[in-house]
């Protein structure tokens, strides 16, 4: 039998009987050249037009009564972005329906599939697929189904189907259900009687489940994560996300802990129109089995907003059930500082020449000691500033009114009022600045001594104190620049500076210390006007600070090296705060800071304070980090003498912290072994006590759709008898081995990170940091 060519069938027979539906092969070939890649998402492309021409080519064609045509042999049907291939295709002219059978492939730019049968209404663009393997092209998701129907513009119904975010030939996990509804516009999938399978083994069942399948915020369950640790045993976390409105959402998380019970977490977020944004978090663990069956809870409310560009509102209030809450349970509640949970609110107003604020601050103590901080109930600040003679003279006033309150009866409550007017003469050129200022610090205290239980302290303090102290400061700085002679191609700057500071000595022993601490005197601290963080103690000064910085910049003006050094000369040695003034010189310790960046892969930072009277270091820190394509390694060291600690902070029980000062060395590293495997670790050692401080090692495997991590931690948590060192005071460690497992893809709460990035979020006491301060 003679075989007719495909061109003859398409152009002669089909055109005569079904002119609107069949075109010559030449037209088809031109169309094929313009079609995009078949596996490409075309959801943003021009939508298929139901009136677009239908192009069919096949080896054979049979026409029946002008009503339908049967195509067979390598049949290919195209309409706009849609393409169907099959062994046989029947075209029903009246209904404009195509029925394809036998090794059918289907692709409409949103889903591609391989099926035994496809029925497609070419007018309404609805279709059904039988015995199908499918893959969504515009969202994650692939799987199998006995029957798939597209009932809307982007709505799919699957019967006896499955879905996974894993790539082809990877069935690490999948969701199997009797019925699945997928809405690609809403990016949600609804499952009826789903079961979750890992390596084809069912591990979870629910009668009903809704999951997001895209990156936009959609209501539904997020995939669970599994963790096993030697401290709390098996942990299973199941989050549910509720997209209440475009500016409101709520995440509810159920956390099962084998050795503690079931913990419920809630996180509500909002974004208001003109009032800012906020967040309300709550956590509740009834009957903690490892904490005497006590209920444990915590909450935080946080709001930040700018109103009418001038009003600022900030609120951060947190509270937990007990002081061991954060030690026992993993939680990101609150703002914690120095063993205290902050509870504070602030309202501020700013204009062109003045600003004011009202602040209230309280704490929840998380340590078992008597070192309670003061509450601010409240603190009001007012500042005014204006130029008087153009840019040659500025006038400003700083003021505050603070009520200090504390529950500890061994410390006084107080009202503090402070007014600080100042005149500033700022002079500047392109290569130098010179700022001279004079200020008057006037402070009034009303101290409540009746409640004091300490008679010695009561005799030292006065109920009312009025203190007025003048301050004079003159600070000059020069910027010089040249082509570097030592390093060709680099620009070197030299920035010497000098400052004179005078503050007369004033007896202040009758004033209690409410919120003031001694500031660290590093290189940049040499040129401050104050030695303390607040105004309860105004240190006398008659001193000359001097120092210089030199910087090296490459041809792109990227800073590569910075060396700074300086010192204070005390004209009046009595104003020197540290050491015995009779036995020491008029000079402070040398302060040196160094930063180095070599070709963006080798970084160094170091700081030293060298005491010239003792010919010894007081304080030092050093960090060296080498970065390479797939990871980094960092070594660091910190050193502080006990004398420096005693001079800097006021702590009655220093032996609970250190016997000989601080001398600690550490090494931190991370490496992405390949596309899937990564490892990280850190180790810190105390050279004074010759003991381990902290161990952490992590190994993680991460595929395209799941991850598993193994972590070992060993941390020094305290000393026996609460005293550092000694034969009977052994260190106490907390050791934990954990395994965590999670799903990647759609509906995951947090995408799994590599082990290197995990260093930023570990629960270890000493976390990974990059203390490099070059201007890059």
From Swiss-Prot:
Q: Show which residues constitute the signal peptide.
A: 1-24
Any one GO CC term of this protein is: cell outer membrane
- Annotated localization: Cell outer membrane
Q: Which InterPro entries match?
A: LipoPS_assembly_LptD, LptD, LptD_C, OstA-like_N
In this record, what's one Pfam family?
A: LptD
The family classification in the record reads:
Belongs to the LptD family.
Report what the protein is called: LPS-assembly protein LptD
